[in-house]
């Protein structure tokens, strides 16, 4: 895709969003920054952004093939994705298949408990307010999204969960939970945005139960980038590695 990258539009905790000469397209650059605890714990890990970008690109392509509307257009190069410009909705949509992390600390669930059907949790994306949990009434009162948009977000989320669980299972990975963000394109259509990577998903090795995600960093352990590289090796096909010239 022949577009010229211009100046910055937005800078988040681990990515920069850049304008291009096409008003409908942005470039998303993945940085090596990693955070936890609402940004209280920080570090920079070489190649982390590189692997997150190729993992996200692969997963976006899998989802697009399954009919999920996303903002993804192409991986320009490892570390940079071209995407549709979205008006982001400040909701973090968390899907839980297995009880782990904060849900166990905040509610009387047992670690490893399976949720059938999966739990869908929505949090207000606001560091200022501590990312509080939302319900439909609060979302509607805040004017964040309409009732129809919420129904569409839930429908897409459940479809994503089904597609992702099957795909990752075929690659030897378990998906306990993951976080999604959505936005509106220029026509008002709801699309999946942000990223889908070990930064936003819990991923466990199916054989060993070993975590291959940001939980490693949360626990203060070594091997974060090695785990992300391993996820990339597990989900990328030889064709992906060749066309994107991925270093593994």
Curated annotation (Swiss-Prot):
Keywords linked to the UniProt accession: ATP-binding, Ligase, Nucleotide-binding, Purine biosynthesis
InterPro entries the record matches: SAICAR_synt/ADE2_N, SAICAR_synt_PurC, SAICAR_synth, SAICAR_synthetase, SAICAR_synthetase_CS
Pfam family, one: SAICAR_synt
EC number: 6.3.2.6
GO BP terms, alphabetized: 'de novo' IMP biosynthetic process; cobalamin biosynthetic process
Reactions catalysed: 5-amino-1-(5-phospho-D-ribosyl)imidazole-4-carboxylate + L-aspartate + ATP = (2S)-2-[5-amino-1-(5-phospho-beta-D-ribosyl)imidazole-4-carboxamido]succinate + ADP + phosphate + 2 H(+)
Pathway: Purine metabolism; IMP biosynthesis via de novo pathway; 5-amino-1-(5-phospho-D-ribosyl)imidazole-4-carboxamide from 5-amino-1-(5-phospho-D-ribosyl)imidazole-4-carboxylate: step 1/2
Enzyme class: ligase
GO molecular function: ATP binding; phosphoribosylaminoimidazolesuccinocarboxamide synthase activity
Disulfides per UniProt: none
Family (UniProt): Belongs to the SAICAR synthetase family.
UniProt name for this protein: Phosphoribosylaminoimidazole-succinocarboxamide synthase
Gene: purC
